[in-house]
Amino acid sequence: MSVVNNRVALKHLVSMEHLTNEEVLGLISRGSEYKAGKVAIKDNSRHFAANLFFENSTRTHKSFEVAENKLGLRVLDFNADTSAVNKGETLYDTVLTMSALGTEICVIRHPEDDYYQQLIDSPTITASIVNGGDGSGQHPSQCLLDLLTIYEEFGHFDGLKIAIAGDLTHSRVAKSNMQILKRLGAELYFYGPEQWYSSEFDSYGRYMAIDHIIDQLDVLMLLRVQHERHDGSQSFSKEDYHRQFGLTEERYRRLKDSAIIMHPAPVNRDVEIADHLVEAPKARIVAQMANGVFVRMAIIEAILNGRNDKV
């Protein structure tokens, strides 16, 4: 991996832990340049990408697809439900096949944590792997679009007070963001149901009730309650969760004028956030979605740079 004059070159992108601060800032800067229309698009029509999604997705899947098309790549159609996966084909063999066909970039979402390790360790698979989310592990492209959204607002990360709130244990978004935000100098707070908190967060910030900190926050990053990863013993009613942990109208009024609200979506309205606040003046949820395309363009460009440089 390398970066020279904001030109980032990556072999794979699977975890925020693998990126230097310089690479992170380079990708954010490049995403901003794409957003501003300052980048001349090269002829990438000889390059092939495949989006292999084994979990449901709207924003990540479609924004990668838009990004790939904006950059002029050829995007292979893949539907797990109609592929050989239904005949028992493993993830490894699916990616091995795509690689053998000449696919250079595989964007993958999979329910297994660290699914990518066997792929990037393979001496046979030559495709570059971009992690579109692994189980409860990492979500690097979401993290990078979150960083771009924050940077557009404040112009820096150092000293910002940021709360990450909600279903922490199951959130790959929380884990990716906490790692890099701490490295960039932000002051982190976590809150949500205690049974959805684990000691792995202790090294990155403080667990604190939202009502004790909300009026000091610069960024409130809400997380989706991942019902599909819970058993019944951990459940709350929608009303109880919203009252105890969600962004209510009363809590919204306590935020600083300069504070922003974020959410990776999909949003459970009137659970994590009151329905009418999703598009409120302080909300940047739609901006996050839009920024996803430009950051993912920067990621794909960095992968193509890395393949050209053979990093």
UniProtKB/Swiss-Prot annotation:
It is an enzyme of class 2 (transferase). It comes from the Bacteria. Keywords: Pyrimidine biosynthesis, Transferase. L-aspartate binds at K87, R172, R224. SUPFAM superfamilies: Aspartate/ornithine carbamoyltransferase. GO terms for cellular component: cytosol. PROSITE patterns: CARBAMOYLTRANSFERASE (PS00097). It catalyses: carbamoyl phosphate + L-aspartate = N-carbamoyl-L-aspartate + phosphate + H(+). Its EC number is 2.1.3.2. One of its GO terms (biological process) is 'de novo' pyrimidine nucleobase biosynthetic process. Carbamoyl phosphate binds at R59, T60, R109, H139, Q142, A265, P266. Pathway: Pyrimidine metabolism; UMP biosynthesis via de novo pathway; (S)-dihydroorotate from bicarbonate: step 2/3. Heterododecamer (2C3:3R2) of six catalytic PyrB chains organized as two trimers (C3), and six regulatory PyrI chains organized as three dimers (R2). Belongs to the aspartate/ornithine carbamoyltransferase superfamily. ATCase family. Catalyzes the condensation of carbamoyl phosphate and aspartate to form carbamoyl aspartate and inorganic phosphate, the committed step in the de novo pyrimidine nucleotide biosynthesis pathway. This is Aspartate carbamoyltransferase catalytic subunit. The gene is pyrB.
